[in-house]
């Protein structure tokens, strides 16, 4: 993640390069546009990721997992919860380690929202972002959904999508 760090404050806080984040979001929107929405799996085991992930799934048509991931769901066809996505989006590769591992075994590409402390092993595309803050997660999932619709030609450049960032925020969030 070092290449995505803009600077380190005196108190030790890592500041990510927002230009890199923006480039990655645009690229990921184009990548996701190549997949049928129902073949995209979006996962968050972090509580602050639940609402943005569910909103993303609803607005785009992707499958979502916000409860405990059942081991074997990507690798064991005999598992009751077996699914075969073509691409996986993880809110936090550390918290969602089991699905990251299984996606690697099943040769499924992985997009991950990563903060400065995350490792990029088994991650194919990264979005450098704060993956623990509820406002940051709402914004990133909103932007990815918007860029995906742009890449599919469903909205024009400069046009707003048929949903707002508020759809991705938790009810308890204040502006």
Which residues are covered by each model-predicted region?
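Ribosome large-subunit tunnel/peptidyl-transferase-proximal elements
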Residues: 1-162, 169
């Amino acid at each position: 993640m070092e290449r995505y760090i803009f600077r380190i404050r005196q108190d030790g806080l890592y500041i990510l390069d927002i230009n890199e984040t923006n480039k990655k979001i645009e690229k990921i929107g184009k990548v996701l546009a190549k997949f049928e929405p129902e073949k995209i799996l979006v996962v968050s085991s972090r509580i602050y990721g639940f609402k943005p992930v569910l909103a993303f799934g609803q607005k785009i048509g992707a499958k979502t997992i916000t409860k405990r991931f059942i081991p074997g769901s990507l690798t064991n066809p005999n598992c009751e919860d077996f699914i075969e996505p073509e691409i996986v989006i993880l809110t936090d590769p550390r918290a969602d380690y089991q699905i990251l591992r299984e996606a690697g075994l099943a040769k499924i590409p992985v997009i991950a929202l990563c903060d400065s402390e995350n490792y990029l092993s088994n991650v194919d595309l990264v979005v450098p972002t704060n993956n623990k803050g509820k406002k940051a997660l709402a914004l990133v999932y909103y932007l990815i959904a918007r860029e995906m619709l742009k890449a599919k030609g469903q909205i024009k450049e400069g046009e707003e999508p048929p949903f707002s960032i508020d759809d991705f925020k938790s009810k308890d969030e204040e502006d």
